[in-house]
Amino acid sequence: MLKLAFVTFLFALASARPQDVDSNRVVALPQDNFEVTDIGFEKIKAEPAPEVVNNDASYAYAVDISVPTTVSQMNCLKTSRYAAVFIRGFTPFGSGAFDTTSVTSIRNAYSAGLGIEVYMTPQPLSSLQGYQQLDALYNGLNGNGITIRSVWIQVTSPANWQKSATTNVNFLNSIISRAKQYGLTVGIYTNQYDWSQITGNWATLSSDVLLWYWHVLGGGVTGETPATFDDFRAFGSFKKASVKQFAQVESVCSLTVNRDVYVVGIPAAASSKNTDFFTQEDISSNNKKIVVGGVIGV
């Protein structure tokens, strides 16, 4: 467990990147407050996010979450002009495991007509190989009637990775290779600092791997950066970005979320308004397969 002391809140939040330091995950906080007792702060209130105003048809808004959700919350996101949701399907806790809460969240998001992408927060210190962790995610979703077409791999919080960049690259290669065996599109969630620290600025990654990068100045509305890609700079093998996380620790529809903007690609089946493919009864009873992923264009 990384211990931080004698630092300001802003530095602490920036050092943690978009994750809490102890669990190496995208920030997805308790409904109202963030406990940060390890660094001497009691609670951080999630501020209400500004209303989405999108005047650029080439961009769309999303949120990323790793907490349980309800149908009403997903419907609220849809009516609040969010087009997609990134849902964690693999948790790093323990040795790493399929995140069972993702099943209900995916069904709820599908019912609401939201586009759905799945990300995994791998556990690089586990005895499980990278491909085994991807298998757990893939089989967990498939066994619950959910077909996955793409996966995003979280590569952040250097303190939670091996010290050897070569070891980390091999671990990631194991995940990526397995994902491609399944025919999945692969994306990486990281930024220039994290990528450099964890992989040694790995520059030979396949060019078909997508990038979701984060850039915030801190938590809440005052820490937001513009919901554009104007601040992107190429690094590693990434010459362009498909998704940007521009806000963290904000409240939307009674959920504490991070907010994202992405380049609009070919709409996925999961984001179609033509929901008569699946009735709510079908979704609840698992009679039909839900297809997720592919919302983000190359």
Curated annotation (Swiss-Prot):
Task: Name the phenotypic consequences of knocking out this gene.
Answer: RNAi-mediated knockdown causes a reduction in survival in response to bacterium S.aureus infection.
Q: Which PROSITE patterns match?
A: GLYCOSYL_HYDROL_F25_2
Q: What induces it?
A: Induced by Gram-negative bacteria S.marcescens and B.thuringiensis infection.
Give its localization: Cytoplasmic vesicle lumen
Q: According to its record, what are the GO cellular component terms? A: apical part of cell; cytoplasmic vesicle; cytoplasmic vesicle lumen
Gene Ontology molecular function, alphabetical: lysozyme activity
Annotated keywords: Antimicrobial, Cytoplasmic vesicle, Immunity, Innate immunity, Signal
- Please state the protein's primary subcellular location: cytoplasm
Q: Which Gene3D superfamilies match?
A: Glycosidases
The tissues where this chain's protein is expressed are given as: Expressed in intestine, IL2 and IL6 neurons and some neurons in the head ganglia.
Q: Where is the signal peptide?
A: 1-16
Give one GO biological process term.
Answer: innate immune response
Q: Where is the Ch-type lysozyme domain?
A: 59-277
Protein role: Involved in resistance to Gram-negative bacterium S.marcescens and to bacterium Gram-positive S.aureus infection.
Q: Which family does it belong to?
A: Belongs to the glycosyl hydrolase 25 family.
| Protein name listed in UniProt | Lysozyme-like protein 1
Q: Which organism is it from?
A: Caenorhabditis elegans
Gene symbol?
lys-1
